[in-house]
Amino acid sequence: MKLVLLLGIGVVAVVGVGSTVLLKSNAPREVTIVNGSNGLGSLKVDNVEFLQNGDFRLDDILLRKPNGETYPGSTSGTALFDQGRRELSVTYPWGEVHVGYAVAGNKLTLTIRTVNSSESDTIQGVRYTPLALKFPDKVKEYDGSIPLLAHNIGQVAVVKLSYGSGSMVIAAEDVEKPLMVGLPWAFNKPTNTEFPLSVHTDRVSSYPDSYPTIVRPIAPKSSDEFVVSLRFGRANATEASLAGDVDKKFTTVFPSTLNWTDRRPIGAIFLATDPQGWSNNPRGWFNDANLNITTPAGHAQFRQHLLALADASIGVMRNMNAQGAITWDIEGQEFRHATTYIGDPRIVDTTAPEMADVADEYFARFRNAGFRTGVCVRPQLLKLSADKKTANQMPVDDPTQLLIDKIAYAKKRWGVTLIYVDSNVNEMDHNALDPSIIQKVSAAFPDCLLIPEHSTLRYYAYSAPFFELRHGVTTTPESTRDVYPKAFSLIYTADGPLDLYKEGLKAAVKRGDILLYRTWYPDPQNEKVKAIFKQ
């Protein structure tokens, strides 16, 4: 026997199994709370208790003097809970914290306002544990080691969790100001059902070094407000169904401006190899140990080889129905990693003088054949040693302007429109640069396609991020397309298991992703790439 009854807005399925009757509801979760003296006394979801500890706790606070010296602030304060307003106020020697608790349907919202009462010192960072959670079942996503944390630097700060009978999302409601939220560890490993909720700015020494610094200082005699929500759902709830409003808020604040309709494949060209110690061919041109660029005859041979490579590449591109090609190393590869790719077309004539009188003709061959051209640029500045035998890529104060200057040069001289942005990371934590940099560069060159090596969600609003098939990436993440439906990526197929991922790549191409392939010679893999586009 099987029947379905409609009760209000929920759907209750009554399933008969022998003499046992099971009720399964798809109605939204219902959150209820009870006030405590130092926070919450209870947090229930459909009458199931989820609160392990409801006391609000300040774990760390770091203040900075005008001279730059930092010191820890006091974490001991005097608490007062306003039962009517459901607001906790805690007074500290350096200021105050006010925490509001609000419930609506399946959501608990915490509003944390930090007041800096100091006349001179800035609050550099804070770390709060507003409460601790107790799940009915083991949290599936926690592996016992990696924190379940998210930040909103260039992305939404949303952590999706599942625990057997249900799911939950932790979200930072503000999509513009940086914040990190989530569950850093379990209290009861390996059971993994009890976790502190963490909200912080600046850095936490016990967290992985790869996490970004959350720069959100609170100036003297001012305040700041963090708004964090816990959203509860059924076991089959998706991140989009629980936090779609946060995604919508994100795209409203950071709308997509990318307009690139050509999704045909793009060819990759590498003219050189990394340093091999060849004194007569120090930049590794054509992986040829016998090439001697120090003589007039060697220069002539270099020119002939380069233009022949261009012609051969064009033949491959026609066969592949490519839209264009990116030359990664027009300056050669004289220096070791991580300076292998110079990424500065402005200095090609001086760093690779043998290229000076042939580079223009090289790129012209592609343009005259009807193909787009491209180069690699970096947001750092190359600094040569005094003897010019070594070099480093140095960060600059204004990477936006540096990228604009490099691209403008290559665009004016060679007509490039395909721009690979190499090593676009912060100096300290090696996370992707602020996406506003890519936004400004994209606005300066609306007819160019930017392809950044590293990316966050917001990068997709202005560019096509780079991925490699050999690392198991076959397409733009669905979570990204939930936010930016027209988002697409550039996926480098070389040395990747094309047969294994063929169906995934077919689906990716249908959705608009672009495949990058080797075009400076007829790579046997190219026919497999070509076949993907002929589905």
What do these predicted regions represent?
Residues 7-27:
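Bacterial Sec-dependent signal peptides at the C-terminal "C-region" and cleavage site
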Residues 430-438:
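Active-site-adjacent beta->alpha loops and helix N-cap segments on the catalytic face
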Residues 112, 221, 366, 422, ...:
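Conserved, mostly hydrophobic/aromatic
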Residues 268-428:
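Aromatic-lined carbohydrate-binding/catalytic grooves of carbohydrate-active enzymes
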Residues 23-335, 349, 532:
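Carbohydrate-recognition beta-sandwich/jelly-roll modules
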Residues 1-4:
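Positively charged n-region of N-terminal signal peptides that target proteins for export
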Residues 362-366, 437-449:
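Alpha-helix-loop-beta-strand connector modules within alpha/beta enzyme cores
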Residues 383-405, 432, 444-535:
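Glycan-recognition surfaces
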